[in-house]
Amino acid sequence: ERTHTGEKPFECQECHKRFTRDHHLKTHMRLHTGERPYRCEHCDRQFVQVANLRRHLRVHTGERPYGCEHCSMK
């Protein structure tokens, strides 16, 4: 429902950015606290969001999921 109403009841007390979901605020707060709970097991880099860790892991696996639309290169 909040998508359509524009309601954002969860506000960051540091920068006053507002969010529709409490877990979005919790993830955002890591930017202010410096918490990086997701660590790469290969090189020890740390990330705020698990999606960023998953994208980073491609560096180690060599995975290149996106191909060029004009040639066969990835």
UniProtKB/Swiss-Prot annotation:
Any Gene Ontology biological process: segmentation
InterPro entries hit by this protein: Zinc_finger (IPR050331), Znf_C2H2_sf (IPR036236), Znf_C2H2_type (IPR013087)
PROSITE patterns xrefs: ZINC_FINGER_C2H2_1, ZINC_FINGER_C2H2_2
Gene3D superfamilies documented for this protein: Classic Zinc Finger
Keyword terms, alphabetized: Developmental protein, DNA-binding, Gap protein, Metal-binding, Nucleus, Repeat, Zinc, Zinc-finger
Recorded superkingdom: Eukaryota
Ranges annotated as C2H2-type zinc finger: 1-4, 10-32, 38-60, 66-74
One Gene Ontology CC term in the entry: nucleus
Chief place where the protein resides: nucleus
Described function: Krueppel is a gap class segmentation protein.
Protein family per UniProt: Belongs to the krueppel C2H2-type zinc-finger protein family.
Full protein name: Protein krueppel
Source species of the chain: Tribolium castaneum
